[in-house]
Amino acid sequence: MSVISMKQLLEAGVHFGHQTRRWNPKMKRYIFTERNGIYIIDLQKTVKKVEEAYRTMRDIAAEGGDILFVGTKKQAQEAIKEEATRAGMYFVNQRWLGGTLTNFQTIQKRIKRLKDIERMQEDGTFEVLPKKEVVQLKKELERLEKFLGGIKDMKGLPSALFVVDPRKERIAVAEARKLHIPIIGIVDTNCDPDEIDHVIPANDDAIRAVKLLTSKMADAILEAKQGEETVTA
């Protein structure tokens, strides 16, 4: 049983690459043809690459590894949050804060601050503080939650990164590479595939395409987790 069908990929517009003038020659091996000034991605290769990425995600999750989903462009934000949450994993879907991986201790301090303010809100501290101070704390909480909410329960570095558009997320990719954290990525015709360990050649600009592929990666994690439940049961 294949993980994904050509029909699903076609319907989601996964085959549409970027304009021919905006391409990375290293993506040539994944390009099928050119049509009306746009590169068309070879979906037979995408099917194979999705299957490889699926197996990789499943294996990492089966070993108890955590995967960090990263996608801050508008077309990816919702899918990244929804699918990472569904799979019980972590995500960054707003802005990648420099040092999220390479300076994780500092990020953990910000996360501690986020949790401290949350606790104050829950335990009634807000009720006894001056109104002005509460307004400031709520603003701070909102900002911290926006940028760190998806990783606030991440205790250590992830075992892998799943990235939508490595060109847009180049800081995240560079940090992961520096720390030898494997990267699985949705890579369009304008990206450098050499930066990514497990390339999924696909349209990274269509919401449906991003949602479809991200959901398959979440499915892989859930399959591994269901396997664990069966074993423990």
From Swiss-Prot:
One of its GO terms (cellular component) is cytosolic small ribosomal subunit. It comes from the Bacteria. One of its GO terms (molecular function) is structural constituent of ribosome. Keywords: Ribonucleoprotein, Ribosomal protein. Pfam families: Ribosomal_S2. Disulfide bonds: none annotated. GO terms for biological process: translation. The keyword Membrane does not apply. Belongs to the universal ribosomal protein uS2 family. This is Small ribosomal subunit protein uS2. It comes from Bacillus cereus (strain ATCC 14579 / DSM 31 / CCUG 7414 / JCM 2152 / NBRC 15305 / NCIMB 9373 / NCTC 2599 / NRRL B-3711).
